[in-house]
C-alpha cells in the first residue's frame, strides 16, 4: 500500500481475514471513454464500454478502429500496440522482424501456422506487442506489457490445442 490507498487497502485486507471473496467496484465519470487506436483511414469516435460483457458484445467496425481499450479511463492512453507480420520488409509496409524494436520479446520471426500450412496457405502469423508507451502503467516508458507470439490473421485458425489462434480472439481474452 501507498499513502494514497492505505485506508482502502487495509480495509480490504481486514475484510479478507474473515471472508474469502471481495468485490471491487470502480466508478467512472459519465464522460469517460475507452482509449482506441484509429486506422489511418478510420473515422471512429470515442465511446464508453463500461464492462467486460459490454466489451464482448460491442460491434466495432474494424475499418474505423484497430484496437480499443477494454475499460474506460485515461490510463489506456499510455498503451501502444505494435504488430510484426510474417513477411519481411517487401515494400508493402510490413515491419521487418530483425529491425523491429520488440524483437527481443519473441523467440523467432512469425511465419506460417501449422493450421494454415495444412490448408495450403502461408504467411498468416503475426506477433503483437502491447507496450506502456508513456510509462503510466509500469512506471517505465517502453515496457512490453504483453507479448502475443505466432497469432494468425486467418479468422478460422486453430492452435495445436484446438483453441482459436485468430489474433482478435486471443487478444480479446
Whereabouts are the PLM-identified features?
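Surface-exposed assembly/interface segments
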Residues: 1-173
